[in-house]
Amino acid sequence: VLRTDGKENLMTSIEIAAAQDKEGKALVPEVCIFFENHLMRGNRTTKMNAENFNAFRSFNYPVLAEAGIHIKYNQAQIHVNKSKQELVPHYLLDTNIVVLKLFPGIQENVVATMLGTKGLKAVVLETYGSGNAPRKEWFIRRLCQASAQGIVIVNVTQCNAGMVEMERYETGYQLLQAGVVSGY
């Protein structure tokens, strides 16, 4: 027997997408995920479970709406674009990006290979905790070299909740000095 919450999620998603304010503008004018009675900002949401109905979480941002008998909108958290300009979608995105997830014992040849990728423009560096990384000389040197070549390196935490604070610990500060930028 297939058990699904898809019908309820779809119906409520359509209701929210169609909701308008007094001026006839979308009540929630942003990309969202609606799941298990919660509306979450799309770029702040992570799928945490492949089997449970409560599969998505927004760790560092509150829900935008909660559905029950009525839909309760969290207006203070919903982004309203005050610009008069129309949306101009960008279809040609640069995909010369790698995600470098750090792990204990990572070897120089692994880091060198990833940072040496032909045409590389950016690296998402997944660090420990609040932005910590290996303190090995070769690691910092490789990051400095990549940064000097114009490769943007963004430091993000591997943790589901919390953020990078590069000036909190010495290892994070070394990354900052190597040209790595905080991804928060």
Stretches found by the model and what they are:
Residues 1-68:
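Internal gly/pro-rich beta-alpha loop/helix module
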Residues 127-184:
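C-terminal non-catalytic interaction/assembly regions of soluble proteins
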Residues 5-9, 26, 59, 95, ...:
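Conserved active-site and cofactor/substrate-binding residues in soluble primary-metabolism enzymes
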Residues 26-30, 94-97, 118-121, 148-151:
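Short coil/turn connectors at secondary-structure junctions
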